[in-house]
Regions:
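Hydrophobic alpha-helical segments
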Residues: 1-114
Length: 114
């Protein structure tokens, strides 16, 4: 489990849920609204130039506000930035245990240096 997943597992108190979502959103125990959001974010990750108003309407019709979409897109974009920066900078990979420890710290204190 990597850093952002470890934070999500810590905040949810449910590592099995995070593992299930990462394995396959559609068969995970997420509710339909969250599955719709994850489908949309997957498109942001892989097909952002082809996103249309119809894509946004599908997520809105699942119950998400424009503000929620703004934050979801922003978090997605920031995570992509950080992941690419780390990949390209030669920062060494951390162990799963180090990610879990960092996840607990980030869940408790936020994404700040402690």
């Amino acid at each position: 489990m990597k850093s952002h997943a470890a934070v999500a597992a810590e905040l949810l108190g449910d590592e099995a849920m995070v593992t299930a979502v990462l394995a396959d959103v559609e068969s995970s125990p997420l509710d339909d609204a969250h599955k719709a959001l994850f489908r949309f974010i997957d498109r942001v990750n892989h097909e952002s130039p082809s996103i249309t108003e119809a894509d946004l309407e599908r997520v809105r019709s699942a119950g998400w506000s424009d503000e929620a979409l703004y934050f979801a897109i922003t978090v997605c974009a920031l995570f992509n930035f950080y992941n690419r920066w780390i990949d390209a900078s030669g920062v060494h990979a951390l162990s799963d245990e180090a990610h879990r420890h960092g996840g607990k710290r980030s869940a408790q204190y936020g994404y700040v240096r402690t």
